[in-house]
Amino acid sequence: MPARTLMIQGTASSVGKSILVAGLCRIFRQDGFKVAPFKAQNMALNSFVTTEGGEIGRAQAVQAEAAGIEPSVHMNPVLLKPEADASSQIIVLGKVAKNLKASQYYSYTPKLLEIIKDSLNHLLANYDIVVIEGAGSPAEINLKKREIVNMRVARMAKAPVLLIGDIDRGGVFASIIGTMELLTKQECAFIRGFIINKFRGDLKLLKPGLDMLEKRTGKPILGVIPYFRHISIAQEDSVYLDERQITSASGTLDIAIIRLPHISNYDDFDPLEEPGCNLRYVSNLSEIGNPDLLILPGTKSTIADLIYLKQQGLAPVIAGMAQSGVPVIGICGGFQMLGSSILDPEKVESKQDRIDGLGLLKTTTIFNSHKRTTQVKARIAADDGLFKGLKDINVTGYEIHMGQTTNANGQPALHVIETPSGEADYFDGAVSRSGLVFGTYIHGLFHNAEFTNRLLSRLRQLRGLPATSTSSIDKQEMYDKLADVIRHNLDMSKVYEITFGRNHG
């Protein structure tokens, strides 16, 4: 039987396409199918490194995990990573191809279309079902002639399309009808039904609107997915950060993450959202407060974001907190900022060839055009301060960075013991003599349950807070919960009929 395709498009960005694709991948896997996700082109700063060292959008890695398969560059052949100068780094089949402004990019898309087609065909040859995710809206008038991710891919894959709208933000009926009105008759024929997402309230009160929508468009409503918070799955859009709830209680650890303008891979910190931790993202002095732990996350534009910290007055505050004993952790670009200086002689990141860092670690970073992307296995090398008792804990993660950092202090953060390429036995990152300032290039560190649980226990001890039981997120359980929610609220018999062209028992 030839492989089948199903495509999820949305009325806008952040309506729930990525999560729905992950849930459908899980359902198809549970039902015995070999299923893979696919997104022709993704624009995101949250990325993932595959086993072969290729970089793809984090959402496709999550979807592959939900499908029970290894992520591949073919699942996201084109990744755009916005940079500080209104250009984007173009990543093709997992590797950096070039940096282009939008006006330059569109002359490059005919070549990309061939690569997209080859990747799609690769998946179709190896899986029973390919669930395809669109981007933004298929009805963007200014982009329709040049887009390579929505209806053009639907035509290429001969994929039936389900259109999803977000009712939580209001205007879902107008957005769905407006989308249909702006599509051509041929494009409308691809859309086989609608899904209403993030609904709160009484479904009976929604029924008149659903009836009107079906009557006006001639397309069925396949389901109404409720708004949920009890399922923790990595998110891709930074809009997600705006929706974080801040809670506090006696005995709670207060963890502040600096929300850099070009923050990337913020899903690094999802495991810190557990009972007993108040995780918050801060952008200015008025929000920073008195945290128990301060984190500088990864960024796509280290120099620009370091300038931002200085302009906002955050740089001296961060340095002052570290000097007063508040632990500070820097990941990737955040690690680079913690050092003495950053040099950019080739102008890889900016027009500046040098900038002073925060001076909390005795490190120097030199940018070059080579981008390092690899998965790693490592052991914690630090054994003082915040990391006392954590030495030799094994962790896994991945590196995605430009530039090399030298450590004049000599105290590394981690000892890398294995990579897929065979490169191993090297040291990563740096730690201050006090053990309270820690920097590393390794993303995904907090996704290692033993490391995170023991780190938080040590932090509570240092801050004079009572010990609590720790927990870790079971990702497989979360994917199953997501599948349960979708099965319960989506007409899966209709979805199977649309996908296979017949009823599926």
Predicted segments, located by residue:
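Conserved P-loop NTPase catalytic core
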Residues: 350-374, 380
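Extracellular/periplasmic helix-exit of transmembrane alpha-helices
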Residues: 339, 343-350
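Catalytic nucleophile serine of serine hydrolases
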Residues: 332
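Flexible phosphate-sensing "switch/lid" loops adjacent to ATP/NTP-binding sites
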Residues: 1-320, 327, 344, 369-370, ...
